[in-house]
Amino acid sequence: MKLHELKPNEGARDVRKRVGRGTSSGTGKTAGRGQKGQKARSKVRLGFEGGQMPLFRRMPKRGFKNINRKEYAVVNLNDLNRFEDGTEITATVLIEAGVVKNELSGVKVLANGELNKKLNIKVSKYSEAAKAAVEAAGGSIEVI
């Protein structure tokens, strides 16, 4: 016996019902869909609830997608401690170091954690608390 000769046990697998293959097959002509009507013709569309007001129309409309939304790559102060003292930090430096994956609309520095290094930071945005922490550590931060 070889692998290609293996067969499942009798009755272990159901035979697929082939419909619409002539009247003598028992499932010809209307193919088990009965006579006329919506379900006899084609599929009922997605979300159809038999004429009842569908769920997506019963719920109120909410919000919108702002096409001008800017999303910034966030960097916290404790992420910046990996750099050497006096390093100039830009978006490209952060991407190369693996701190952020991509720049998105720019990089924003937030004040989560502590900064122990004197760094020169040039980013798109920063919080006031982050600015205070960077300057307290002896560094500088500016918007480019």
UniProtKB/Swiss-Prot annotation:
What ranges does the record list as Gly residues composition bias? 23-35
Gene3D superfamilies associated with the record: 3.100.10.10
Basic and acidic residues bias locations: 1-14
Which InterPro entries does this UniProt record tie to the protein?
Ribosomal_uL15, Ribosomal_uL15/eL18, Ribosomal_uL15/eL18_sf, Ribosomal_uL15_bac-type
UniProt keyword annotation of Ribosomal protein present: yes
GO molecular function terms noted in the UniProt entry: rRNA binding; structural constituent of ribosome
Q: Which Pfam families match?
A: Ribosomal_L27A
Q: Name one GO cellular component term.
A: cytosolic large ribosomal subunit
Instruction: Give one GO biological process term.
Output: translation
Give the UniProt keywords, A-Z. Ribonucleoprotein, Ribosomal protein, RNA-binding, rRNA-binding
Q: Where is this region: Disordered?
A: 1-43
For this chain, the family text in UniProt reads:
Belongs to the universal ribosomal protein uL15 family.
User: What is the role of the protein in this entry?
Assistant: Binds to the 23S rRNA.
Task: Summarize the subunit comment.
Answer: Part of the 50S ribosomal subunit.
**Could you identify this protein by its name?**
Large ribosomal subunit protein uL15
